[in-house]
Amino acid sequence: MNKKYAKKFKKKPCQFCEAKLFYIDYKDIEVLQRFINTFGKIQPSRITGNCAKHQRKLALAVKRARFVALLPFIGDRIRGNYDKTRV
């Protein structure tokens, strides 16, 4: 790729660092669902903008929430229970 046309992307700031949150609660489903895609997978930090420390804590919180059945293991898109007009 020609360097002349290379796009420079600015890294998104970590939402947890900005809010000065040290603990990501696995019972806070509204926060955790923002970081899960329609397939039920955890979104990577390059998309969400999380730093490495908070991405690890987020992954642990999502896994704990799945284990106690607060979050599904698979998303609505795989089950077919999603709004097909949004895709």
UniProtKB/Swiss-Prot annotation:
Origin species, per record, is: Mesomycoplasma hyopneumoniae (strain 7448) (Mycoplasma hyopneumoniae)
Q: What is known about its subunit structure? A: Part of the 30S ribosomal subunit. Forms a tight heterodimer with protein bS6.
Q: State if ATP-binding is listed as a keyword.
A: no
What name does UniProt use for this protein?
A: Small ribosomal subunit protein bS18
Which Pfam families does this UniProt record tie to the protein?
Answer: Ribosomal_S18
Q: Which UniProt keywords apply?
A: Ribonucleoprotein, Ribosomal protein, RNA-binding, rRNA-binding
What role does it play?
Binds as a heterodimer with protein bS6 to the central domain of the 16S rRNA, where it helps stabilize the platform of the 30S subunit.
Q: Which InterPro entries match?
A: Ribosomal_bS18, Ribosomal_bS18_sf
